A protein has these predicted regions:
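Domain-level signal for soluble alpha/beta catalytic cores
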Residues: 1-275
Length: 275
């Protein structure tokens, strides 16, 4: 959403910008880092062969370029870089596993050691892929994030407690969390609904409620409201906080200020992630 806002583009895979306008992508990463982000995600959320119509060579170029851009931007800030992988859907189960393995192997070869699987509605392929990552690179850090409606159920009809228990019991996932679908307040209610989490918990809510103007989606939310609300959730034991759709550098700056002004990251906290 921030890329579309800055470039006034729409309807084209944003991941292609890693190849076509890499300096713009690097500039956006840098804006979030200057705002205080301690971690960034590669611009690769939908970079897979299901979305890009089986073009393996193109997807590999997007992934490698996305990693290089993010790593270059993060280096002066000593920030973490997470290889960002969205859901792989629309394929037979065996093909989904093969696609995930292709994605993570490409990232591993590029140097990735932190992985974010986000916006998931089920655990399909996730545990097996995390196991593969750990087999190849035992020191890798794997974060799995689910998208759930305020009642605690995902788009595929799974209850969040069930999903988190499954990935936690696998032993291959280092942290779990929620992202997208909801704003700060509904996500806070999800945390209370979940109760005690067996793994470090990550939250990346949307900046606010979406509105559509002239075919483009915007998220109405004051950065201070976002920052103060998310910082308050940290006191409930959340370890990693950041933002999803609609989150601008100003939202991250407000979040960092709110954390410094009274929100205390729980033990093991390591990142504020951006989108």
């Amino acid at each position: 959403t921030y890329y579309a806002q800055k470039t006034h583009t729409r309807g084209k895979g944003v991941e292609l910008a890693n190849i076509e306008t890499p300096l713009v992508v690097e500039e956006i990463h840098t804006e979030y880092l200057r705002a205080g982000a301690q971690a960034i995600k590669t611009n690769t959320f939908a970079a897979n062969c299901s979305v890009y119509q089986g073009d393996t060579a193109l997807v590999e170029r997007i992934l490698r370029s996305g990693w290089e851009i993010a790593a270059r931007a993060a280096e002066p800030f000593d920030a973490y870089v997470f290889a960002d992988i969205g859901p792989v859907t629309g394929l037979p189960p065996a093909d989904i596993l093969d696609e995930y393995r292709f994605l993570v192997d490409t990232f591993l070869a590029a140097g990735a050691r932190h992985f974010l699987f986000e916006t998931n509605s089920s655990t399909e392929g996730l545990v097996e892929t995390a196991a593969h990552i750990k087999q190849v690179c035992p020191e890798a850090f794997v974060l799995t994030s689910f998208s759930a409606f305020p009642g605690g159920y995902t788009r595929d009809g799974f209850f969040v407690e069930e999903l988190i228990r499954t990935v936690a019991e696998s032993g291959y996932i280092d942290a779990v969390g929620f992202n997208c679908v909801s704003g700060v307040q509904p996500m806070k209610e999800l945390v209370h609904l979940l109760g005690k989490c067996p793994l470090p918990l990550s939250l990346m809510p949307n900046a606010g409620h979406p509105i559509v103007i002239d075919g483009r989606t915007f998220y109405e939310s004051a950065p201070d409201y976002f920052g103060d609300g998310l910082a308050a959730i940290v006191r409930d034991g959340v370890s990693i906080v950041g933002g999803c759709c609609g989150t601008t550098p100003e939202h991250i700056r407000a979040l960092c200020a709110a954390l410094a002004d009274g929100g205390h990251m729980s033990e093991g906290a390591s990142a504020q992630a951006e989108r």
